[in-house]
């Protein structure tokens, strides 16, 4: 009997059964993979996106798979829409939320001297301000759940230079520090906060870059694993950080990049043995 109880406890450490989650930007790419990963582990998930048509297409696929997913349209760069989103989530989940994944984000690639004030404001509001404000709004719901977890989807561009734009890298670097601050401030409320930094991942956002075969080959050559990552290789880490099994992991910035961020210069022709 004791063994059965221990086995049951072990299984619950690796399950999200009965938990609730909000994932922003969940209709494609990493966000879509995160929605599916959390739902497969038993969570009830609400997700949002700007494109209603794409959101409904994804919803039909999730329903066909038997996932417990609901959706709403939201542009996270809008403060009013963020507040409306959290009201929806609070109503759906009876004022309690276990998981918040701040995934929605965007990138404008330009030389620094070509950025406009509008570019700066848009990137800041979409990437950083939305993560900050949604975390603020979600705090009472996460606290009420008794077991809360926030994951901020940052970028490898937050920890090393990647020439995709200085403002983008700055927003993501600030997200990492936000995660550290909230992890310490909200630990007493039983809320964990971590940031995940994807490297080059095969997503709709990156597809425009990878159409350039020369660029793609250059990227693959600098990644130790020799390939671009897949969205589900990011979502698996996100899901782990939300599990009871990861209860002691908080305030961390974790790269999912095939070793890109730690790679120096590899001498291809130099024999190592």
Curated annotation (Swiss-Prot):
Superkingdom of the source species: Eukaryota
Reactions catalysed according to its record: tropine + NADP(+) = tropinone + NADPH + H(+); pseudotropine + NADP(+) = tropinone + NADPH + H(+)
Annotated transmembrane regions: none
GO MF: tropine dehydrogenase activity; tropinone reductase activity
Function according to Swiss-Prot or TrEMBL: Oxidoreductase having both tropinone reductase I and II activities. Involved in the tropane alkaloids calystegines and cochlearine biosynthesis. Can use tropinone and nortropinone as substrates and produces both tropine and pseudotropine. Able to oxidize pseudotropine in the reverse reaction.
Phylogenetic lineage: Eukaryota, Viridiplantae, Streptophyta, Embryophyta, Tracheophyta
Binding site for NADP(+): 22-46
pH dependence: Optimum pH is 8.0. The pH has no influence on the tropine to pseudotropine product ratio.
Miscellaneous section: The hydroxyphenyl ring arrangement of Tyr-209 determines the tropinone orientation and the formation of either tropine or pseudotropine.
InterPro entries assigned to the protein according to its UniProt record, in alphabetical order: NAD(P)-bd_dom_sf (IPR036291), Sc_DH/Rdtase_CS (IPR020904), SDR_fam (IPR002347), TR (IPR045000)
Similarity annotation: Belongs to the short-chain dehydrogenases/reductases (SDR) family. SDR65C subfamily.
EC assignment: 1.1.1.206, 1.1.1.236
Positions contributing to substrate binding: 155
Protein name in UniProt: Tropinone reductase
Pfam family, one: adh_short_C2
Natural source organism: Cochlearia officinalis
Keywords: NADP, Oxidoreductase
Active site: 168
């Amino acid at each position: 009997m004791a063994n059965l109880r221990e086995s049951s406890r072990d299984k619950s450490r690796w399950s999200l059964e009965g938990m609730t989650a909000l994932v922003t930007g969940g209709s494609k790419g990493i966000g879509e993979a995160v929605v599916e990963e959390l739902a497969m582990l038993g969570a009830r998930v609400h997700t949002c996106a700007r494109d209603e048509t794409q959101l409904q297409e994804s919803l039909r696929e999730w329903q066909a798979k038997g996932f417990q997913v609901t959706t709403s349209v939201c542009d996270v760069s809008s403060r009013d829409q963020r507040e409306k989103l959290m009201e929806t989530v609070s109503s759906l989940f009876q004022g309690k939320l276990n998981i918040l994944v701040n995934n929605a984000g965007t990138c404008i690639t330009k030389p620094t001297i070509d950025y406009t004030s509008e570019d700066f404001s848009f990137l800041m509001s979409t990437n950083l301000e939305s993560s900050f404000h949604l975390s603020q709004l979600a705090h009472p719901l996460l606290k009420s759940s008794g077991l809360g977890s926030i994951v901020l989807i940052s970028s490898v561009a937050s920890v090393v230079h990647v020439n995709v734009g200085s403002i983008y890298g700055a927003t993501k670097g600030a997200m990492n520090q936000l995660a550290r601050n909230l992890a310490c401030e909200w630990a007493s409320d039983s809320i964990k906060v971590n940031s995940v930094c994807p490297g080059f991942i095969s997503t709709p956002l990156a597809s425009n870059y990878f159409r350039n075969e020369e660029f793609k080959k250059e990227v693959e050559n600098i990644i130790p694993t020799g390939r671009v990552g897949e969205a589900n290789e990011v979502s698996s880490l996100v899901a782990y950080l939300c599990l009871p099994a990861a209860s002691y992991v908080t305030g961390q910035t974790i790269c999912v990049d095939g070793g890109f961020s730690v790679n120096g210069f590899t001498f291809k022709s130099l024999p190592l043995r």
